[in-house]
Amino acid sequence: MSCQAFSADSFTTLAGDSLPLLMHHASAADCLPSSASTHTHNMVSAVPSGLSLLQSSKRSHMHLSTSTLGNALSNGPPGLHYPVTPCHYSNQQTTYGMMAAQEMLSASISQTRILQTCSVPHPNMVNGANTLQGSLAPCLYKFPEHGLGGGSCSLSHSFPPLPPAVLSEEPPLGGTKDLRLRSRPPDDPPDMDSPQIRELEKFANDFKLRRIKLGYTQTNVGEALAAVHGSEFSQTTICRFENLQLSFKNACTLKAILAKWLDEAEQAGALFNEKMGMNERKRKRRTTISLGAKEALERSFGEKIKPSSQEIVRMAEGLHLEKEVVRVWFCNRRQREKRVKTSLHHSSYLTKDSPTYR
């Protein structure tokens, strides 16, 4: 509220039921109407007792009670009714003990009017305060909260303590665990003469021999494993494993996978061979005919090139051979005789057509 000096010509006549205009002047007598001068004089007489109490206490924090002023004003004329609200300032350092009685009365009335004005906030101020509160929400420290009640006005400062996570200098438990895992040195590979290395070399050699026996190539194994375990398996991976060019950890991991695949491949190969053996026609073993039996069959072939079925049976019984063996021999002998006759006829034809030179 700004204070301005007015001349006597600037004042207008007020109605009787209107409130008096409160201005900041040198004294309360300049701003109060004449009808309240007597009432003010009676009210000031009660103030020195309170001043003596304040001067004797000599405290830095002052407690100003205006209950006496409120009672005095409540008994005044109806046109001069100023509701006085007691105020408590916890951080007030100014002492009003040395102020004059009239200036003290003017200051108390002015403060009462200001507090009444501040008790009803403007809508724009409320909206602005809400916006400011929303923008300052992420801050660690909150601004001081000012509470204005209906019967008292108190100013207090509240600063929430910092979170324990901010004040603590120790890393969280999760971070300590991760740090411990990261700082752990990697496992050293075993020596070249260790049992693990020898067992790995033996398995690599056995795997190569059994793979070749089953008829699989390194590419076939890589494609079969890639279809099940992913694209990290290829012909290069199998080749490096058989040549022991992988790291010990990767070789051990691949060993378990290859051992499982090898067992499945052998089982599948055994089943396949069994089915093929059942479906395949058995080939008869080759029959060996003695020289005496061949001479007897040659004589019979000279007599009759194509014997009957009964004659074949009698010859088979006489030579102690099977009927089918005798029949096949006569078929093969006729085919050979036919080839010999064809070749002789062709050679004689070439001899007749060729010219003779003398």
Swiss-Prot record:
Location relative to the cell: Nucleus
Annotated segments matching region Disordered: 164-195
Domain POU-specific positions: 192-266
Cellular compartments per GO CC: nucleus
Compositional bias ranges of the Basic and acidic residues kind: 177-187
PROSITE patterns given in the database record: HOMEOBOX_1, HOMEOBOX_2, POU_1, POU_2, POU_3
Residue ranges of the annotated DNA-binding region, renumbered to this chain: 282-341
A single MF term (Gene Ontology): core promoter sequence-specific DNA binding
Domain of life per record: Eukaryota
Major place of residence: nucleus
Pfam families for this protein: Homeodomain (PF00046), Pou (PF00157)
Keywords from the named record: Activator, DNA-binding, Homeobox, Nucleus, Transcription, Transcription regulation
Biological-process GO terms, alphabetical: positive regulation of gene expression; positive regulation of transcription by RNA polymerase II
Database matches in Gene3D superfamilies: Homeodomain-like, lambda repressor-like DNA-binding domains
Record-linked CDD domains: homeodomain
Span of the annotated motif 9aaTAD: 5-12
Chain's role: Transcription factor that activates growth hormone and prolactin genes. Specifically binds to the consensus sequence 5'-TAAAT-3'.
Domain notes: The 9aaTAD motif is a transactivation domain present in a large number of yeast and animal transcription factors.
Family under the similarity heading: Belongs to the POU transcription factor family. Class-1 subfamily.
Protein name stated in the entry: Pituitary-specific positive transcription factor 1
Organism whose genome encodes this protein: Oncorhynchus mykiss (Rainbow trout)
This protein's encoding gene: pou1f1
